[in-house]
Amino acid sequence: MVKNIVDLYTRAVASFGETLQHVSLDSWEKRTPCDDWTIQTLVVHVLSGEVQLMNLVEDETYSSPELSPNILGPDPMSTWRGTAINAIRVAQDTPLGKELPHPTVTLTLERLLGARITDNAVHAWDLSQALSLNH
């Protein structure tokens, strides 16, 4: 049973990671259902969202996300796992009502987690479609 939004976030991140495990080295340039996005573009987008969550909570700064493939490093799955684990830890250790800096909206951790849940869940499905997996 899901107790709270942090549990939902953890499950959404895990779902994306489980799907990401199926990406082979020759799959990164495959198209996704997202217009003009490859698997690599999609993974960079989701990964940078988790990095942004940590920046907003820990550093209390908003910066434009890094959308370069370089963010994936030499082992994208290891990069994902480490980033996901750290983002989940930050979410678990931070009060949901904490206000976060953002240039356009009043943002709390709870609202940000709602957005991250949606992003991970939707893009796990997009990724599964690009890989011809059932999701």
Where are these regions (language model features)?
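Short, contiguous alpha-helical
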Residues: 27-65, 104-135
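An N-terminal domain-cap segment
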Residues: 1-37
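Amphipathic alpha-helix face/heptad-repeat signature
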Residues: 5-12, 76, 80-83, 112, ...
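Amphipathic, well-ordered alpha-helical segments in soluble domains
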Residues: 12-19, 49-52, 83, 119
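Surface-exposed helix-capping loop/turn segments at secondary-structure junctions
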Residues: 22-28, 93-98, 133
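Short, helix-capping/interhelical loops that line the mouth of catalytic, cofactor-
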Residues: 1-4, 43-103
